Amino acid sequence: MNQVDGRHVVEERGAWGVLAILTAINLLNYIDRFVFPAVAEGIKRSSLNPSDTALGFASTAFLGVYLIAAPFFGPAGDRPNRTKWVAAGILLWSVATALGGLARTMPELLGARALVGIGEAAYSAISPAILASYFPEERRARAFAIFFAATPVGAALGYVLGGFVEAHWGWRQAFYIAGAPGPVLAWLVLRVRAPVPAQGARGRERGALGTYRHLLRNGQYRLIILGYAAYTFATGGIGIWMPVFVQRAHGTSSVVANTQLGSMLAVTGLLGAVGGGLLGERLLRRWREAYLWLSGITTLLAAPLAWIAFTTANITVYLVTLFAAELLIFTCTAPINSKLVDLVPPGMRAAAMALCIFTIHLLGDVPSPTLIGWISDRSTIQQGVLVIPVAVVVSGATWILAAWRGGRLSTAQVIEA
C-alpha cells in the first residue's frame, strides 16, 4: 500500500511536526516505564523490602494491565477522535507514575504501576496508526525509525534519571519527576488533527471482534507477532534486570550501573533504530520481505553475543558484547513495526497494533521479569538471565520463517492471508 490515508494528502511539514510531538511523547513513555527498574535496588533496601520475585511481579502488574487494556483502545485508534484518547492516556500514566512515589506498601506500588499500564496502552496502540497516516510506505520506515528511537533513548534516560535521583534524593522523588511533563505533552497532542483512516467504515462494519478475527486469519501477521513476543520476552528481561545484574555480578554501584547501561541503551538504540530504518528502506526497493529478513538475521546474530555478555566474569567483555548485542537487537525496531502497519489496510492499523501489544506482552515481558526473578531467587541472577538469548534465537528464527512464507505469496495474498 503506497497511499497516505485520510481525506487529503498531509503537507510534509505538518507530518514532521506530528512526528516530533509523538516522538517526544514516546520518549516520556519510556522514561516513566524505566524509572522503575532503575530504582529497584533502592526499593528493595527501603521499608517495602520486596523479594526479587515481588520486584519482577511489579513489572508484571504493569504489563498485565497494559496488554489487557490495549485491545480496547485498538478500535478507538481507527476512529476520528483518536487524539483525545491519546491525551487521556498520557494524563493517566503521568499521574499514576507520580502516585508510585507515595506508595507505602508493595500492593500500593503495584496499583500505581497498573494504572500506568492503562494510560500507556492508549498511547501505544493508537500512535503508530496516527503516524502511519502521515507517511507513505516508501518513507514510513524512516519516520518509524525516529519514533521508535525514542524507545531506547527514553529507557536510557529513565535509567540515568532514576539512578541519579535515587542516589541523591531517594527513589520516591524519581517517580515524582518522571510524571511531571505529562500534562504539557497531553495538551500538545490535542492540537494534532490526525487524518481519518480511509477504510474506517469497513472496520466499523466488522466490529472490534470481527476485526481481530480478520487479523488473526493472516498467517504472516501471526508469525510476526509471535516472533515479536519472543523478542519482547528478551528485551523485557534486559530492561528490568540488567541494572540489578551488573550490580550483583560485577559489583558496580547503582549510579555507575544505571549510567553505563543508560548510555549504552541510548547509543545502541538510536544507531540501531535509525540505521535499521534507513537500511530497511534501501533493501525494500529490491526485496518485498526485506524488513523481515533484516529483522530475523540481525536478531539471530545478537544471540551468541548476549550469551557471552551474561556468562563472562570480565566487565569489559560484558560491556562490549552487550553493546554489540543491543545494537543488533535494535536494528529491527523500525523495520518490524513498519511491516506490521504495511501488512494491513489503513482502517485496521490501530487494531493490528493493539492485538500485537496484547500478544507480545502476554507471551513476552509479562512472564520474563518474574521468571528471571524466580530463577534468581533459587540460584543466581547470572543463571536467571540466560533465558534471554534463548528467546532471541526464537524471535529471529520466527521472523525468517515469516519472510520465507511472505516471499511465496503475492502482495494481495499476504494482506488477506
Model-derived features: positions:
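Conserved MFS/SLC helix-loop-helix module at the cytosolic interface between two early adjacent transmembrane helices
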Residues: 68-104
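Cytoplasmic helix-loop-helix junction between adjacent transmembrane helices
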Residues: 112-151
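Residue-level signature of mid-helix packing/kink "hotspots" within the transmembrane helices
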Residues: 30, 34, 63-71, 121, ...
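Juxtamembrane intracellular "pre-TM" segments in multi-pass secondary transporters
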Residues: 5-11, 196-225, 249
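Helix-breaking motifs and short loop linkers at transmembrane-helix boundaries and internal kinks
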Residues: 49, 81, 102-108, 119, ...
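Extracytoplasmic gate region of multi-pass secondary transporters
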Residues: 36-37, 218-274, 329-333, 337, ...
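Structural signature of the two symmetry-related core transmembrane helices
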Residues: 84-98, 291-306
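Helix-loop-helix hairpin linking two adjacent transmembrane segments in secondary transporters
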Residues: 147-191
